[in-house]
Amino acid sequence: MNWTGLAFVLVSLVALGGCATAVPAMSGGSTTPKNRTDIGLGGAARVPLGDLKDPAVLDPGQSQNRYAADAGGVVPMAYGRYGIARNWDLGLMVAGATVKAEARYEKVLREGTTRSSLVVGLAPYGGWIPDRDRSGSGGRVGFEVPFVYGVDIGGIYELWLGARGSGEYVFGDFQISGSEQRASGAGLRLGPVIGMALGVRRIHALVELTAAYEYWFIDHAGGALNRGGFVLIPGFGLRLRL
């Protein structure tokens, strides 16, 4: 396994990424088998709705933090997972300018040609919010708890259905009324996720959709900018198992 090459790909994706926090789960139908490695490459999008949706026209006098904390967009994505023990794996994902580490455990419900299991994980993440049109920049940290029911049919077809919950903190200096001022905020996100994979032997194509409700508690220059709404996070990619 060429870990140097994988690291180069991940770092390159960070450099190319935009400010959208489009981080998919890409759970698959099970954890990565012991002493095996999964490598995935693809993309993801973040589509905010309602009060989270970006305005069509940027108001120079409005807080630019809202465009950074929960902005929409499309980003490249890559991940790697390694099976450290039976039913346990560790992973690392880069989606745009966000990096997520992950530890997962699998409770097998049924063995055989059709294999089913419950997969739960804990995934801390962090990243930076790059400057967009001189609106300011900052960073983000958070954690996610994914929980899915997965089915693997003959190693050809996989299906997973479950939920993702996360908490996030954003911070930085952003424009408001013509000057950069400190801003910070905390966000909570919860919603269902569904995905499927289809392939042969070691190569599979994956598609996934998360539909979540999130709420932000934001302070910018002493003003409260709380808001909430729904967000869609579709993801897609190719997975190679080594």
Range-by-range predicted roles:
Residues 68-74, 90-103, 132-141, 153, ...:
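Solvent-exposed loop/turn segments connecting transmembrane beta-strands
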